[in-house]
Amino acid sequence: MAAVAAAIPIEPIYNMEKLSYEIFSILESKFLFGCDDSPRLSPSAKNLPISVAGGGGRVRILSIDAGGSTDGLLAGMSLRHLEMALQKRSGDPDARIADFFDVAAGSGAGGVLAALLFTSGPDGRPIFTADEALRFLAENRGSRRKGIFGKLFRTRGDKRGRIFRRIFGDSTLKDALKPLLIPCYDLSTGAPFVFSRADAMETDGFDFRVREVCEATAAEGGRRKGTAVVARSVDGRTEVLAADGGGVAVGNPTAAAITHVLNNGHEFPLANAVDDLLVASIGNGECDGWRRAEDFVRIAGDGVSDMVDQAVSMAFGQNRTSNYVRIQGNNACGSPHSIKNSSSIDTEKLMRAAEEMLTQKNVESVLFRGKKVAEKTNTEKLEWLAGELVEERERRMACAGLPVVVLKQASPRSSSSTC
């Protein structure tokens, strides 16, 4: 009989209190109680010459919010624009999002996007381009059922995962091109559970099929075991009962991604503080009106996402404009396509609303001052980000020092009897 996740010795569950503690610990040490500028090297980098250990590049993190008011379409459109900009700036028409990021985290619709863009196909390249991923979201959004992926969840049992099975086949987390973090809410433990490539590399007990990971993070059946999505590890030893999806568990996974990098010295030996990171956090629009229970859930999710944005922006401090980019739509700007209830809006109109959000002025979080409207639009911020990502890749190609990222390699598949 399969054991629930809580029975496994290694625990990849990210408790929200722990996440808050981690990110605000950074705030305390860096801004609130004095600043220690001395570098803190991870164990794998302590014995290196200072010129090598301190001369590396930045770890590039991509974080994608849950559905938001655009059901994932704003993030999909942002990533399509970013991928096109990367192709243009790098001169490589085959460049993909996964080529320019070291870590990807996504929740809900954002988790599905991350899986589409970072899962390896038979040719060793991502199975979807950003444009194909956007079209996948648009085609499978569903217009008559509340929430994201209505078409995917009209039937129960095995039929529910038919589309994900067709897309991902038997690919598992080990097939992710880069470290991947995708959360859901686990009924077995009553806490968020994060599917992680790093944990999958350690043991088959944490290696899940990507199709089940996507079902889990996009689940919207409510917290009843009869409607929960079941995800089992490839060895059958770990079972996750996912309900409410990743959007309720961790709507904005940026803090989880940062915590993962700063506490993973094996794969990121030179990442000692937020100054060593380049973070792109992609939102999915905020609700500006609500009437039903699910709308209150959405607005609560928006509030949590904003809180994470504020915390991360504060952690970066003066470097927030060069190391941290947040792309988010603001429905309070008097848009003619203002979104009151995305489930009642057809996909074409929602796509137009997402396009308009990209033309809005970017909104930045400022230390102790809330938010301010930036001079650049969201589109211009994406263009700037593309330039930073291309420069970072070129810098790494020209540097012969210690790699910024040393990914764990997949070990031979162990049997279910292996401890």
Model regions and ranges:
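Conserved catalytic cores and adjacent C-terminal regulatory segments
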Residues: A2-C419
